[in-house]
Structures are given as structure tokens and as C-alpha cells.
């Protein structure tokens, strides 16, 4: 430690140096505490340690602008689920009526918990491991669980990007390769591929040409080399986007976050001009109010809110940790949440405008096929021509005319009617067909685009949008893995990031087998749902009940410069934990009531069949959930019995129990005890104080406090005035 003038004079005169703590700090020249050497209390022989400043933020990267940060949060939270899951849930759960429970739960669960993660990340300026270690060391396992969940999600999520890459490259041809069934040679006769003839061209292309899928999860079938190459491309894209941290990913976000909105806007305009688009939108938003009383609707709405904002992954915390301390994260939480909701509604409009068009196409096809059946029955005298209304013209048969004719035949030929095999061809039935996930993106949407003018252009735009949506979410997911590990273990950023991508690619080969789609279903449905719910409820408890909601609100007031709404106090303290507990219980009950299974594509039947997971797959599923949640009890037990150090003796800064921030500027000037904290290891460490008045960077030399009348400073020594980062 650099010597002040008094100490220098006494050392030159060989006098015995005795300084109080206050004198040493008050007369100190500017100092760089990162190289200070302290004697730590409780260590035998006065062993010296280099106190590396754990919460140093001098070298921490920062966002180039507020816009870049907001786009990163939007890119992470707005993902493929907004495009293919929210519209499905909206249709399934009452149309416009579903928006009511969704909005209510967004306000009482989504925004408060999103704000909580933004606040702790911004204040403590560490990834998920460091943040929860500082808030409550015994719950430090939360951060490790978040990393594991991010790894599980990243493994299969990038496979979906790989699928989109495959379709993207296949879109540069006319006609689109999934617009017609392939023709095969059977000797000298050309016939349509039977599997395609029984299903549809787009369904066949997805299951056979793209996935080359096996009949069950137990039939591996070997690697699909086309998807293996696409997965390699996907991980290469992600690796290049995140290898330099936010310096590289931040720039990528300008395109990956904004481009999907351009595409959605173009699709909406084009979709509204399609015949039948209004039918789809009206069907979508026609409220079925009785659905609002169904508990299942509220459970699914809560789950969607929960995952739509990316809570519990650690990506939100990682991104906010690169913010300035005085950033208004209160505003950010509301802004990102409502942009997310707006995106979901926009995507729903686009999806059902397109599906309304598709429903009209399919309904007209149904009318033509059944009209041909009726003509056959008329020609064979199975039906009398007297049953056909006189104004019906088979050459220009409308949907209305067919419905009238169908009703007459069904009434007159009541007993023989089932044997005729006629369909009602109702538009409502087509619109009611629930489509979600890969079925929406790679079957329903691709089929609709085959009927678009200039279909290759729209196909390229659509799959490029999916790639960008997936990339934005993957950047946040990778940040949830790399940021806490790099912060905690100080590993080289570039090397660790590249290593993660290479490791994930090789593990991801599991998902590009012929049975890989079934593993994607398993990971998507079960590997993250329950663990993330547990993670977020423990985050809420750690801040609201262990640290204390009142103290947390005080810290936010100091950090933001204004007091957040009292609304958040009650949400964090009571409402959100209760809702999360109910959601966790409901998820566990759902697992027990409905045995886990998957939809398998049976080649011989050219149809899907729901199968239950075999015993080994159930064991894998349970292992995934256990591995994701195991760090929480393990770290708790190890720290409870003092088998794992909380690292307090290696920190240059220790913290009073139950305080995240300590501003010493308001303390009494002559109170020397203000520089000495409790020897009890911190239960809630915190970042550096907001206001620092007199110390700045400078040269250092070792500080030997063995002659100090107060004894060794111990682990409670407070670096009250280390310069605050410009971040």
C-alpha cells in the first residue's frame, strides 16, 4: 500500500509506526486496492493474502448503448415460442378470452420477477452464480442450476435453428420442394410416393426428406447427415456471435432483434390481402368466455408468461450485469415485457391470417373432392338427382351450395348416410385444428406459402426470421452459461466460449439421429419446465424473504434515485411466491396424471401416433430434472455444514449481513469502527458502495497491520472508497 506522508517520515527516522485505521485511510494517497496485500483474521501466523477484488468492475465490458442492451433483452425474451406456441395457446384456450389471464399473470408474475432479475444483475454486476452467492451463499446453487438448464435448452434449441437453416437453403428453388409429392418408379409405372399420398406434400417433406424420422424413440436409425451439417452451421453462427462476449453479440442483436419485426410486418400486410385471412383473425379473437373459468387455462398462461420472458435462465441477469449502476431497470422491465406481449399478439395475427387463408384452400379442396363423390353416386343411381337443389352448379360449386346439398342428403338418407363417406367441409373445423411448435412452422406455414405468389421469396424470409429469432434467444442462453462461469472461475472468455460450442455440437448429435426429433420433444417438454419453476421461486424467496423486501426496496431506491411502486413490494413478498408455488404444484401433478409421451410418426400409416416413453427414456427424463435441480440442495448442505467455503476470506470486500450496498459517506467522520465489520462471513454480500469520495487509482505496496493497536483487520475490512467503474 502506498505510504502517506506521516508513515514515510517515521520509516525514514526508524520510528515504530502505529496508525489507526481511520488515519491510514483518511491520509491515504490514491490507491489501487486490487493489488493490496492484507493479513486476514483467523489465519495462523499472519499469513498474507493477495486480496483480489471480487466485485471489481473496472475491466467489465459494457453495452455500447442503451438501445443495444434493450435489443439484447428483447432478442433473448422474444423467441420461437412467441411465433408457434402463443398463437396455439390462444386458439386452444378461448381465443380473445385467453388474453385476459395472460395479461393478469404477466402483471403479477412476469413483470415483477423480470424486474427482480434485472435489478440484482445490474446492482451486483455478476452472472447468475455470483449474484445468488452474494445474496445468500446457501442458495448459491441457484446459479449453477440456471447454467445447467441453459445448457439443456441450448443443446436442443440450436437443433431447431439447424432445421430452419435446412429449410432456408431449400427455399432457393421454384417450385418449392415441398409443394408436390415425389413420383417414384414401380417398374415401368410412375406412382406417387405412398407415404406422401396418404398424408400431404409438406408433411412428407418434413418427416421424410428433412428428418428421415424413425418410427419410435427406441429406433435410433443413425445420424441424419443433412441435419448434422446444418447443426454444425448453426453452432458456427452462434459461436461467431458470442465469442467476443457482448462486443460481438451486441452488434449481432441490431439485426437479429429487428429483422423479425420487419418480416412479421411484411407477412401481416401480405396475409391480410389473402382470401380468407379475415376469417382466421375473427376466429382467433372470438372470445370463448367459459374458458376463463378453467384452471388449466390459467396454468398454461402462467407457464407461457414464465418462459416468454426467459426467467430463471440467467440470461436476463447476465445481460443486465453489463449495465451502468444508475440504469433505469424499472422502466426496462415494463418495456421489454410489453414488447414481448405485443410481439406475441403480432405473431398471432400473422399466423391466423395465413392459417385462415390455408383453411379456405383446404375447405375448397374438401368441397371439390366430396362433390366428385356425389357426382359418382348420382351417376351410379345411389343418389337421386331430386336431392340436388336446382340452383346448384357442379362446375362452379360454392361452399354455401355444398353445405346446403350436404344437409339435404344427410336428412333424406339418414340411415345410409354414414356409408356415403361425405365430409361436411366446414371452415370452422379447419380453423379449429390446433397446430403448434414444429407442426406450425414446418408443416402448416410451409403449406400455406406454396399458395403464395413468389413463394420462394416468402419462404426465404420466413426461415431467415426463424433463424434470427433463434439466434437472439441462443445468445442470451449462451450468456446464461458463459457469463457466470467466466465471472466465477476467471477462465479465458474466447477459449471457454468456443469450447462450449464444440462440446454442445457433439452432444447435440443426439438430436440429429433419425429419432432425434423425439429427444427434442423430451428436452423441450420436461428438461426445463420444472427446474426453471423451482429456480425462479427460490430466487423470489432469496430476495423477498431471506434478504428482505423492505431492504431490497431501499437498495433499489438508492440505485435508481427514486422509489419503485409499492406494488412490487406486495408482488415479491406474497403474490408471486404464492402463484409460483401453485404453478410448481400443478406441474408436478400434471406429470403424475399424464404419463410423459411423444407423438411418433409411423411410416406405414403415414400418420402420427401418441406413444409413451419407454422405461429407459423415463429414467433419462428424471435424470435431466434431477441434474438440473441437484446443485441447489448440494450447495445448501455443504455451506450449512461449513464443508464449502463462501469465499469471504479471499475477498477484498466483506459485507454486513443483509445489506447489498453500503454508502459510508453518511457515517460519522470520527467513528473508526465504521471501517471494521463483523467477523461473521457475509450472508448477503453486495457490490461496491454507490458514492466514493476520496480514493483513486495509484501505486501500491504491502500493508502490514501487525502493529496496529486494533489488531489484524480480518475479513471485515471494508474498501470503502475504491473507485467506481464508469460502467
Curated annotation (Swiss-Prot):
Q: What is its main location?
A: membrane
Fetch the InterPro entries from UniProt.
Na/ntran_symport (IPR000175), Neutral_aa_SLC6 (IPR002438), SNS_sf (IPR037272)
One Pfam family, short name: SNF
| Expression across tissues | Expressed in the brain. The strongest expression levels in embryonic, postnatal, and adult stages are found in both cortical and hippocampal tissues.
Query: Where Phosphotyrosine occurs, residue numbers?
Result: 377
Q: One GO BP annotation here?
A: protein catabolic process
Instruction: Report which reactions are catalysed by this protein.
Output: L-proline(in) + Na(+)(in) = L-proline(out) + Na(+)(out); L-leucine(in) + Na(+)(in) = L-leucine(out) + Na(+)(out); glycine(in) + Na(+)(in) = glycine(out) + Na(+)(out); L-alanine(in) + Na(+)(in) = L-alanine(out) + Na(+)(out)
Q: Where in the cell is it found?
A: Cytoplasmic vesicle, Secretory vesicle, Synaptic vesicle membrane; Postsynapse; Presynapse
Per the record, ranges on the Extracellular side are: 90-96, 162-224, 270-304, 356-451, 514-528, 592-618
Its membrane topology? Multi-pass membrane protein
Source species, domain of life: Eukaryota
Asked if Transport is a keyword of the record, the answer is yes
- Entry similarity comment: Belongs to the sodium:neurotransmitter symporter (SNF) (TC 2.A.22) family.
- Give the protein's recorded name: Sodium-dependent neutral amino acid transporter SLC6A17
In the UniProt record, the gene name given for this protein reads Slc6a17
Amino acid at each position: 500500500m502506498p505510504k502517506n506522508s506521516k508513515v514515510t517520515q517515521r520509516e525514514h527516522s526508524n520510528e515504530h509506526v502505529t496508525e489507526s485505521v481511520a488515519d491510514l485511510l483518511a491520509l491515504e494517497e490514491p490507491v489501487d486496492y486490487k493489488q493490496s496485500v492484507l493479513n486476514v483474521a483467523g489465519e495462523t501466523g499472519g499469513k498474507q493474502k493477495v486480496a483480489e477484488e471480487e466485485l471489481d468492475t473496472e475491466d467489465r465490458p459494457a453495452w455500447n448503448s442503451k438501445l443495444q442492451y434493450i435489443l439484447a433483452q428483447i432478442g433473448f425474451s422474444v423467441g420461437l415460442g412467441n411465433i408457434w406456441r402463443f398463437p396455439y395457446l390462444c386458439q386452444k384456450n378461448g381465443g380473445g378470452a385467453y388474453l385476459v389471464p395472460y395479461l393478469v399473470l404477466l402483471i403479477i408474475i412476469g413483470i415483477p420477477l423480470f424486474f427482480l432479475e434485472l435489478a440484482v444483475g445490474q446492482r451486483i454486476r455478476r452472472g447468475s452464480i455470483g449474484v445468488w452467492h452474494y445474496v445468500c451463499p446457501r442458495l448459491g446453487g441457484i446459479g449453477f442450476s440456471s447454467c445447467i438448464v441453459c445448457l439443456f435448452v441450448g443443446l436442443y434449441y440450436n437443433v431447431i435453428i439447424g432445421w430452419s437453416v435446412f429449410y432456408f437453403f431449400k427455399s432457393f428453388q421454384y417450385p418449392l420442394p415441398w409443394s408436390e409429392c415425389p413420383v417414384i418408379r414401380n417398374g415401368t409405372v410412375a406412382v406417387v410416393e405412398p407415404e406422401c399420398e396418404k398424408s400431404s406434400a409438406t408433411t412428407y417433406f418434413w418427416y421424410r426428406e428433412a428428418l428421415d424420422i424413425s418410427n419410435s424413440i427406441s429406433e435410433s436409425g443413425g445420424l441424419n447427415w443433412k441435419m448434422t451439417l446444418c447443426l454444425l452451421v448453426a453452432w458456427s453462427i452462434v459461436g461467431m456471435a458470442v465469442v467476443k462476449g457482448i462486443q460481438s453479440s451486441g452488434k449481432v442483436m441490431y439485426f437479429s432483434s429487428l429483422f423479425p419485426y420487419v418480416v412479421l410486418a411484411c407477412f401481416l400486410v401480405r396475409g391480410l390481402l389473402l382470401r380468407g385471412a379475415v376469417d382466421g383473425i375473427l376466429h382467433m379473437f372470438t372470445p370463448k368466455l367459459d374458458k376463463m373459468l378453467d384452471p388449466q387455462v390459467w396454468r398454461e398462461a402462467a407457464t407461457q408468461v414464465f418462459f416468454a420472458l426467459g426467467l430463471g435462465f440467467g440470461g436476463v441477469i447476465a445481460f443486465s450485469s453489463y449495465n451502468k449502476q444508475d440504469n433505469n431497470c424499472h422502466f426496462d422491465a415494463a418495456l421489454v415485457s410489453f414488447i414481448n406481449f405485443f410481439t406475441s399478439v403480432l405473431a398471432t395475427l400473422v399466423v391466423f391470417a395465413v392459417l385462415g387463408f390455408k383453411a379456405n384452400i383446404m375447405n375448397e379442396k374438401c368441397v371439390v373432392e366430396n362433390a366428385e363423390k356425389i357426382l359418382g353416386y348420382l351417376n351410379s343411381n345411389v343418389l337421386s338427382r331430386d336431392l340436388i337443389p336446382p340452383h346448384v352448379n357442379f362446375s362452379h360449386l360454392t361452399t354455401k351450395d355444398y353445405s346446403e346439398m350436404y344437409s339435404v342428403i344427410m336428412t333424406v338418407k339418414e340411415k345410409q348416410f354414414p356409408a356415403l363417406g361425405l365430409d361436411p367441409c366446414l371452415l370452422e373445423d379447419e380453423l379449429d385444428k390446433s397446430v403448434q411448435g414444429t407442426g406450425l412452422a414446418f408443416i402448416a406455414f410451409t403449406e400455406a406459402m406454396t399458395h403464395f405468389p413468389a413463394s420462394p421469396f416468402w419462404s426465404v424470409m420466413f426461415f431467415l426470421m426463424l433463424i434470427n429469432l433463434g439466434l437472439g434467444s441462443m445468445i442470451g442462453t449462451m450468456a446464461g452459461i458463459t457469463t457466470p462461469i467466466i465471472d466465477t472461475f476467471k477462465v479465458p472468455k474466447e477459449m471457454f466460449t468456443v469450447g462450449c460450442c464444440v462440446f454442445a455440437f457433439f452432444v447435440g448429435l443426439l438430436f440429429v439421429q433419425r429419432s432425434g426429433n423425439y429427444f427434442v420433444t423430451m428436452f423441450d417438454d420436461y428438461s426445463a419446465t420444472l427446474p426453471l419453476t423451482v429456480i425462479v421461486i427460490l430466487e423470489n424467496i432469496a430476495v423477498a424473504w431471506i434478504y428482505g423486501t423492505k431492504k431490497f426496496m431501499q437498495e433499489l431506491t438508492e440505485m435508481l434515485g427514486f422509489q419503485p411502486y409499492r406494488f412490487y413490494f406486495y408482488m415479491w413478498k406474497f403474490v408471486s411466491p404464492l402463484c409460483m408455488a401453485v404453478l410448481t404444484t400443478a406441474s408436478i401433478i400434471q406429470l403424475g396424471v399424464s404419463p410423459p409421451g411423444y407423438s411418433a410418426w409411423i411410416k406405414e400409416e403415414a400418420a402420427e401416433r401418441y406413444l409413451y416413453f419407454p422405461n429407459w427414456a423415463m429414467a433419462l427424463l428424471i435424470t435431466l430434472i434431477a441434474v438440473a435441480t441437484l446443485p441447489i440442495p448440494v450447495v445448501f448442505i455443504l455451506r450449512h455444514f461449513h464443508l464449502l467455503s463462501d469465499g469471504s476470506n479471499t475477498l477484498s470486500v466483506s459485507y454486513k449481513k443483509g445489506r447489498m450496498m453500503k454508502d459510508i459517506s453518511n457515517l460519522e467522520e470520527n467513528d473508526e469502527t465504521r471501517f471494521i465489520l463483523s467477523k461473521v462471513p457475509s450472508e448477503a454480500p453486495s457490490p461496491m458502495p454507490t458514492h466514493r469520495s476520496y480514493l483513486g487509482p495509484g501505486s501500491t505496496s504491502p500493508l502490514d497491520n501487525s502493529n496496529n493497536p486494533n489488531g489484524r483487520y480480518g475479513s471485515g475490512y471494508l474498501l470503502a472508497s475504491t473507485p467506481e467503474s464508469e460502467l
